[in-house]
Amino acid sequence: MSKVSGSNGGDSKNTLYCSFCGKSQHEVRKLIAGPTVFICDECVELCMDIIREENKTSMVKSREGVPTPQDIIKILDEYVIGQKQAKKILSVAVHNHYKRLAHASKNGDVELAKSNIMLVGPTGCGKTYLAQTLARIIDVPFTMADATTLTEAGYVGEDVENIILKLLQAADYNVERAQRGIVYIDEVDKISRKSDNPSITRDVSGEGVQQALLKIMEGTVASVPPQGGRKHPQQEFLQVDTTNILFICGGAFAGLDKIISARGEKTSIGFGATVKAEDDRRVGEVLRELEPEDLVKFGLIPEFIGRLPVLATLEDLDEDALIQILSEPKNALVKQYQRLFEMEDVELTFHEDALREIARRAITRKTGARGLRSIMEKILLDTMFELPTLEGVREVVISNDVVSGVARPLYIYADRQEEKANVSA
């Protein structure tokens, strides 16, 4: 027991003692009471030292174990189809970034600058998914922000500091871990300057946001309110150094291919003028020739582009790539739905031509890989609605006609060789 009665006088009659070190309440500054135990401030401090030391050790281990670019690409290949050049650029940039952090104290006179990354590519080509997978490989906190919701401080909308707050939340409020995390800012093409001409009205969601992002991307100590900025003005702020946070920005940049195609082309007028042939290359092929000056013409300010020295362009996905995405990666959509059907003890089978038709529809919609799930949901909706109440179904087969909407899925029953085609008229 921590509470001891003594016979040395009135003072020691109800003296309390620390259950861990045995010191009395008179020998320590504070004694914290639990249901049946007490702990002194010195023991609490000792426990904190032990925890800090363990955290430091685990940090050192993670820093020393930076995966090589080849290792990173190998894991990316398991989850992301295609985009070989973009994967190579990203794996080298991420490896160098965390290698720089691992050897930060050994650099001597040479200080290595941070290389943030800009991903440019059509909608649904895998920009966001690449960033998420990278964070998982390196095992660091990751957060995603939508640039369209951001505004300058003092205006309605989200402050840029809220991005750091989300990262801190992803790190369970561990500031050390958050300071080594990855932030992905999506839709940066939507914060481009509204026009080349200076305007009387302030552009708070365009150039203003770019200006606000400059500091946190370059490196600053951000004061982050734990409960979100504007609703609780009296709360204490957490200090987060953004110097070692890796920022990855992404956007579709619709129309950027036209700016690239127009660059360097000489125009002439009159009867002797050469008729300019239309560029019939795919968007992804044109984007390979991207230069920083093209992004300036698009509407990003030079200072913002300067904070993103690594440029990686992604190609639009063709039919074959979309079929691979449907069936090959570890968490491919087909495998996900097959797992769902397995929970009902039913096997789900897709014909090859059905997958091809799904890919064609995604290309027609111009939604890339992102549109595949909505197409799959529409195809399988009725089946998933009926299946839990049907008895004896062992297999569901999806053909090209099912995807085209001219037939219902084929149900194969186990107890009899009966097939229910449900072909619609």
Curated annotation (Swiss-Prot):
This protein's encoding gene: clpX
A biological-process GO annotation: cell division
Its quaternary structure? Component of the ClpX-ClpP complex. Forms a hexameric ring that, in the presence of ATP, binds to fourteen ClpP subunits assembled into a disk-like structure with a central cavity, resembling the structure of eukaryotic proteasomes.
Fetch the Pfam families from UniProt.
AAA_2 (PF07724), ClpB_D2-small (PF10431), zf-C4_ClpX (PF06689)
Residue numbers binding Zn(2+): C18, C21, C40, C43
Q: Can you name this protein?
A: ATP-dependent Clp protease ATP-binding subunit ClpX
UniProt lists the family membership as follows: Belongs to the ClpX chaperone family.
Keyword ATP-binding included in the entry's annotation: yes
Q: What does this protein do?
A: ATP-dependent specificity component of the Clp protease. It directs the protease to specific substrates. Can perform chaperone functions in the absence of ClpP.
Q: Tell me a Gene Ontology molecular-function term this record carries.
A: unfolded protein binding
Q: Which residues form the ClpX-type ZB domain?
A: 6-59
| Keywords noted in UniProt | ATP-binding, Chaperone, Metal-binding, Nucleotide-binding, Zinc
Q: Which InterPro entries match?
A: AAA+_ATPase (IPR003593), ATP-dep_Clp_protease_ClpX (IPR050052), ATPase_AAA_core (IPR003959), Clp_ATPase_C (IPR019489), Clp_protease_ATP-bd_su_ClpX (IPR004487), ClpX_bact (IPR046425), P-loop_NTPase (IPR027417), Znf_CppX_C4 (IPR010603)
Task: Show the Gene3D superfamilies listed in the entry.
Answer: 1.10.8.60, ClpX chaperone, C4-type zinc finger domain, P-loop containing nucleotide triphosphate hydrolases
| Protein residues bound to ATP | P122, T123, G124, C125, G126, K127, T128, Y129
Q: Which GO terms describe its cellular component?
A: HslUV protease complex
